[in-house]
Design a protein with these regions (language model features):
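Auxiliary, metal-adjacent structural segments of Zn-dependent hydrolase domains
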Residues: 46-117
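Active-site recognition of the HExxH zinc-binding catalytic motif
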Residues: 110, 115-136
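Extended hydrophobic/Leu-rich segments
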Residues: 8-12, 24, 42, 115-116, ...
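Acidic, contiguous N-terminal accessory segments
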Residues: 16, 23-24, 30-34
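Acidic/histidine-rich, surface-exposed loop or edge segments in extracytoplasmic proteins
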Residues: 30-53
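Short amphipathic alpha-helical segments that mediate assembly, nucleic-acid/protein binding
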Residues: 5, 17, 21, 59-62, ...
């Protein structure tokens, strides 16, 4: 990760991430640890798009899926009992949400390209909600 990426990450962490993290905590109902591998979330030529794509790819689907799961007490309890951590990374440049999400041993992993199909938020929400409902 070069200086440009480090500057972007710092700015994103200071300006957008706190609000997104608060929304995740509110949606999930507790302060779930977020393990974000920031250094993997870059492709040089797309740096100018990340302010828009990061929330759409990594955070808004989590918020909406957690809201769907915690819509009732049964969902709140299941999530609180099962979810230990959310890990966000990009190791395989997945752009299809079916391949980008996994849930094992209490860890929800989001392994998605930082840019591809950014506007497909609803599809990611559906796949993520289905994954959680099947594994909680």
């Amino acid at each position: 990760m070069g200086l440009k990426e480090k500057r972007f990450t710092k700015t994103f962490q200071e300006e957008q991430f706190p609000q997104l993290k608060t929304q995740i905590i509110e949606a999930v109902g507790f302060d779930v640890p977020l393990a974000i591998e920031w250094e993997t979330l870059f492709e040089d030529r797309f740096l100018h798009l990340y302010n828009d794509s990061y929330p759409k790819i990594y955070f808004l689907p989590l918020i909406e899926a957690f809201k769907a799961i915690t819509a009732d007490e049964m969902g709140k309890e299941a999530l609180a009992e099962s979810l230990r951590e959310v890990r966000i990374t990009n190791t395989k440049d997945h752009h299809n949400p079916t391949n980008a999400y996994s849930f094992a041993e209490g860890v929800l992993t989001v392994d998605h390209s930082p840019i591809l199909n950014a506007d497909n938020v609803e599809e990611r929400v559906k796949v993520l909600t289905d994954l959680l409902e099947s594994n909680l």
